[in-house]
Amino acid sequence: MGFFKSLNSKPTPKEVAKDRLKLILIHDRGEIAPDIIEKIREEILEVISKYIDIQVEDVEISVNKNGDEEGENTSALIANIPIKSIKGR
């Protein structure tokens, strides 16, 4: 019965957020438009706020690009999200 449940189940918000973050990190070339970053910010905060009380006004999210010695460019999503409390405790 668990097998059939796993075939028809929707991904959890945690899994969706994780997949979105992976896509951002994979996108290591090119610029990310500010409107896309804002949309990512909104969606991440929506998922996180289901589990944690956060200070939305103090959230900082940015994308940093770095180059290494071999000329490879990498990007990192940096999120500073102040936590008020964990829900369900």
Swiss-Prot record:
Quick check: keyword Cell cycle in the entry?
Answer: yes
A biological process (GO) annotation for this entry?
A: cell division
SUPFAM superfamilies named among the record's database cross-references: Cell division protein MinE topological specificity domain (SSF55229)
**Entry keywords, A to Z:** Cell cycle, Cell division
Q: Which domain of life is it from?
A: Bacteria
Family matches, as InterPro entries: MinE, MinE_sf
Which pairs of Cys residues are joined through disulfide bonds in the record? none
Give a yes or no for keyword Transcription regulation in this entry. no
User: What does this gene product do?
Assistant: Prevents the cell division inhibition by proteins MinC and MinD at internal division sites while permitting inhibition at polar sites. This ensures cell division at the proper site by restricting the formation of a division septum at the midpoint of the long axis of the cell.
Q: Which family does it belong to?
A: Belongs to the MinE family.
What is the protein named?
A: Cell division topological specificity factor
